[in-house]
């Protein structure tokens, strides 16, 4: 049929074929399509001698099409907006299933196997977009109604974890982005989905709810917005601060300094209390500053990714509560949520910002945050509009509340695929075989192991001695280069062995150290052997570079 349709020079047949094609795209039943196909073949055979019959047939099919359109219009007059959106989405999924049936071959098809050493692109495609069971992948589609039934499912791609494995790649052991689990990556490959689809709405709503569990914040309002972790700074400054508000910034590295820069860009007045690289600000000095001036907010970088220094958040919030209880507490948890224990409500944190690509364990692209009831009240009592459009909670609050209530709302299009991945990861974190408390303990254990191994290799942490006991992150380690060695002696050679570490980042000593990430799936799934691998490879590189333990 498709081959005949390509004969465009046959005017009569082309007209009828176009009508048939339009009927197929519109999803007409198989019986009607078979009739149209028969008409096309008949018209082609009789073209030269039966032009009058051709015109009659064209007229008949056009009349049928008009009648069907009228019927569809009448039936749609009582259809709600949501039902219409669902119908469009279902039609798109049926179309995708049809296309998959024509294009996809099974994984064991020898003609699809990539040459040895080459990434199996087609095989990967078939595993992610596999046609529903029973589809004729070689010789055309099965019954369209079966595809429609499959398309109504709200599940992720039908490929099971046992059949999907991500392509071979270098082991990513930097403090974010991190390694992503196979099931999370597969969820990210979910077919394109309308953000108002009845299938997507509960996925978004449940993801919002699970954020509260991860941060132990039952009373707080979560936000899931397209963007990087840095967007969280903008959200805090745009919604909680107003022009000339004083903010006390506790900084332990590059990201604390950058947060202060962001606050200034929004019209605030940041005062930084910084510490030398590898240490933490003095709490007595912090308390003195709070007594000297009324600050609208205090910002804390829980773990600064540039140094791996861990702030004692409960100690800081206790000082705030006793000295300046009206001051808001804003916590940057980009490099801590998921790998460090957090009790947002109990600690008295008013705004927690983080991202998708670190302890949460999904690809980059989501700015995640939670606001306490006090933070929401502060926003609602502003004397000026929020200093931003995309960042305004006035726009986002109705959206988050709607989806949590299992109804759609719209301000800006959410990244549906990433939210499917987020849902999968959060479900594993909150309902999986490894509990949240066990997850945090596994990160503590892995951190101790890495730091002990570093010491045994004759290396030192960037963290100063007074911070090494309880002031270092459990999801990363910053390591000083041994005497006589530098980045070119370590990082490229690790990459050659299939492991990626991160370079230094602190402005005062970025060339003096490198950073190892150990969080997420690399820690929670010991069967991967990621920690074993990096320690073994690092020792090999050090020996090759001529380093001797002291």
Predicted segments with their positions:
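Conserved N-terminal alpha-helix of the aminotransferase class I/II PLP-enzyme fold
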Residues: 187-235, 239, 254, 258-264
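PLP-dependent aminotransferase-like
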Residues: 239-296
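Conserved PLP-binding catalytic core of the aspartate aminotransferase-like
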Residues: 461-494
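N-terminal "arm"/small-domain region of PLP-dependent enzymes with the aminotransferase-like
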Residues: 147-198
């Amino acid at each position: 049929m498709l081959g005949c349709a390509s004969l465009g020079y046959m005017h009569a047949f082309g007209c009828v074929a176009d009508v048939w094609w339009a009927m197929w795209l519109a999803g007409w039943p198989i019986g009607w399509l078979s009739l149209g196909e028969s008409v096309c073949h008949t018209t082609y055979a009789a073209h030269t001698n039966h032009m009058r019959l051709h015109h009659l047939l064209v007229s008949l099919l056009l009349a049928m099409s008009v009648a069907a359109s009228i019927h569809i219009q009448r039936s749609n007059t009582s259809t709600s907006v949501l039902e219409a959106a669902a119908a469009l989405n279902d039609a798109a999924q049926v179309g995708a299933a049809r296309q998959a049936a024509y294009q996809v071959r099974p994984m064991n098809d020898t003609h699809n196997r990539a040459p040895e050493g080459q990434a199996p692109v087609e095989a990967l495609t078939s595993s992610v977009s596999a046609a529903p069971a029973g589809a004729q992948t070689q010789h055309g589609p099965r019954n369209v109604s079966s595809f429609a039934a499959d398309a109504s499912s709200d599940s992720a791609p039908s490929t099971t974890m046992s059949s999907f494995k991500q392509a071979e790649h270098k082991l990513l052991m930097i403090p974010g982005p991190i390694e992503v689990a196979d099931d999370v990556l597969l969820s990210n490959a979910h077919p394109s989905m309308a953000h108002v689809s009845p299938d997507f709405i509960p996925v978004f709503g449940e993801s919002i709810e699970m954020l509260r569990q991860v941060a132990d914040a039952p009373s707080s309002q979560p936000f899931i917005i397209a963007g990087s972790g840095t967007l969280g700074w903008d959200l805090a400054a745009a919604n909680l601060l107003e022009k000339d508000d004083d903010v006390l910034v506790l900084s332990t590295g590059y990201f604390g300094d950058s947060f202060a820069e962001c606050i200034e860009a929004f019209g605030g007045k940041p005062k930084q209390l910084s510490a030398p690289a590898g240490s933490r600000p003095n709490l007595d000095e912090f308390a003195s500053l709070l007594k000297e001036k009324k600050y609208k907010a205090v910002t804390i970088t829980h773990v600064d990714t540039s140094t791996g220094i861990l702030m004692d958040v409960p100690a800081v919030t206790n000082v705030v509560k006793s000295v300046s209880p009206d001051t808001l507490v804003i916590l940057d948890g980009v490099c801590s949520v998921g790998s460090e224990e957090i009790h947002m409500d109990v600690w008295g944190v008013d705004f927690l910002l983080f991202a998708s690509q670190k302890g949460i364990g999904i690809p980059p692209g989501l700015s995640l945050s939670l606001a306490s009831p006090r933070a929401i009240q502060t926003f609602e009592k502003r004397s000026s509009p929020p200093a931003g459009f995309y960042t305004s909670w006035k726009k986002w609050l109705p959206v988050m509340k709607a989806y949590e209530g299992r109804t759609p709302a719209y301000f800006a299009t959410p990244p549906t695929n990433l939210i499917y991945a987020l849902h999968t990861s959060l479900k594993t974190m909150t309902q999986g075989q490894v509990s949240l408390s066990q997850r945090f303990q596994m990160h503590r254990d892995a951190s101790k192991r890495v730091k002990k191994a570093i010491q045994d290799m004759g290396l030192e942490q960037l963290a100063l001695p007074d911070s090494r006991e309880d002031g270092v992150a459990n999801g990363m380690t910053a390591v000083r280069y041994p005497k006589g060695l530098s980045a070119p002696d370590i990082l490229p050679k690790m990459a050659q062995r299939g492991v990626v570490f991160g370079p230094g980042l602190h402005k005062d000593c970025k060339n003096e150290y490198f950073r190892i990430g150990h969080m997420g799936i690399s820690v929670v799934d010991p069967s991967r052997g990621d920690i074993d691998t990096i320690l073994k490879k690092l020792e090999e590189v050090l020996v090759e570079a001529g380093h001797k333990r002291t």
